[in-house]
């Protein structure tokens, strides 16, 4: 079922990389031995966003736990490291002068964080069209116009409006995974510096995250709105005759070798 819905998303949205199925795991022994692990197969620790990039670009199924990840911000979001006074102080030292003008400003972000408080031990990340897991979250890296179509599709069935938050940082892990899980609502994610520097996200990319249990709603709406005429690629209106600014038109006609003049005369003479 999820494979079919993944193919529908690829058909109607045409993302440049695979939509991702992300499954949370309670225990490490739930991970099959043949799934790739950064610590086992790559012989290193890395950032979570790097694994999103490898899965969506290479088509790999990747499993991670805290043993695989050395991103302190991600470890705090997933609850793999406790939030202590020392952790808070480190985050403030990191932010002040970079993301915030002072400690007081930096600390305001904590009021808006969604943390998973060690609710699970890891993630399995797999391309949706060939997913080996039932997703808790589906992540689609896309262009803004593609995100528009995903939003239209979801709201076709649900109505109302989607509400998003953004801090310009901690995008895929915080808003893409944690907030989507805790609110059970789709999120439009402005990917931050981590996603772009280490996670390989392009300048043009954003991300749309959908709870796995609501993927059917999204796909139903995509199909219906596509049939009604809302499409991607956007069918730009082309049924018009081009022209020039008045000050440029005379010179343009000369440079066109008479083509524009003859064309106009053709229609005038019937």
Predicted features along the sequence, with ranges:
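Acidic, serine/proline-rich low-complexity intrinsically disordered regions
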Residues: 3-270
């Amino acid at each position: 079922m999820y494979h079919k819905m993944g193919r529908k998303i690829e058909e109607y949205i045409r993302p440049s990389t695979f939509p991702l199925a992300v499954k949370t795991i309670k225990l490490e022994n739930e991970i099959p031995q043949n799934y790739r692990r950064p610590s086992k197969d790559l012989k290193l620790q890395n950032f979570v966003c790097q694994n999103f990039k490898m899965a969506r670009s290479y088509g790999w199924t990747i499993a991670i736990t805290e043993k695989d990840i050395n991103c302190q911000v991600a470890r705090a979001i997933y609850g793999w490291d406790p939030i202590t006074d020392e952790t808070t102080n480190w985050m403030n030292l990191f932010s002040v002068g970079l993301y915030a003008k002072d400690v007081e400003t930096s600390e305001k972000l904590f009021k808006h964080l969604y943390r998973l408080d060690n609710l699970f031990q890891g993630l399995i990340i797999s391309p949706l069209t060939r997913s080996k897991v039932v997703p808790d979250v589906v992540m689609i890296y896309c262009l803004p116009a593609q995100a528009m179509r995903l939003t239209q599709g979801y709201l076709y069935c649900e109505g109302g409006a989607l509400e998003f938050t953004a801090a310009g940082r901690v995008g895929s892990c915080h808003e893409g995974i944690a907030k989507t899980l805790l609110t059970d609502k789709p999120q439009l994610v402005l990917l931050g510096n981590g996603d772009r520097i280490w996670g390989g996200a392009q300048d043009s990319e954003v991300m749309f995250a959908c709870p796995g249990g609501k993927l059917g709603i999204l796909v139903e709406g995509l199909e219906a709105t596509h049939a009604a005429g809302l499409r991607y690629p956007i069918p730009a209106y082309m049924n018009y005759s081009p022209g020039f600014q008045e000050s440029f038109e005379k010179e343009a006609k000369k440079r066109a070798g008479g083509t524009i003049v003859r064309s106009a005369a053709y229609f005038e003479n019937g």
